[in-house]
């Protein structure tokens, strides 16, 4: 292999390595490049399918996005932005411009996005990802994911809302869901507990500050502090002591502390446990 061919080999592999796959057109091959690529394919260094050149172990979702010349979105892009993985990943979700011609790829969910510009990126911007989830994702989990994005300042509420204008494309439902989101929720289980309690008719305020106590996860019906405790943050002796002192301070103020585990929330026991605690507290008072 001559110098020009070796340089071209390095260029091709260097372009593909960051994501594992590229559409053949993105390689901009000349006659030397085509010969080098043929050799790489014959040697098994690279593979090609649907005009996508990829590494042997490339992520199928990336291959799907490159095949459609689109961007990964929805559950296929949550990990990219460090958002909660509380939705099943399933088949790849790919966003394409709304005016793209007919597409019917098997094993891929295609989302047509007005105003989407596809460049060299692999993922949609976070605000577009969240706007799409608000339109078509399951309500509880989607709100929890948006809560997390707002809490970590990944996006602003206004950036998401700008993509949800008009009456079509499920935008009214998405705007209603966005209105239920809050930047004050600090975990997905905290968000899910809040949503379930609101759906059951309870008043729930997130991140309320109580003098002498601190910030409450979820303040229910202005009387119960619902804490959703993850073991990792409450397992040390000092954390255990702080939790008990906090509960004592709440009780001294006539407020009821209730601590639920991750399993309590994810098993759907939040409403029944909270309502039982409220009923018992009411009988004693």
Feature names for model-found ranges:
Residues 1-170, 279-285:
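Short gly/ser-rich loop at a beta-strand->alpha-helix junction or flexible surface loop bordering the NTP-binding
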Residues 32, 150-285:
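Surface segments flanking catalytic/ligand-binding clefts of nucleic-acid enzymes
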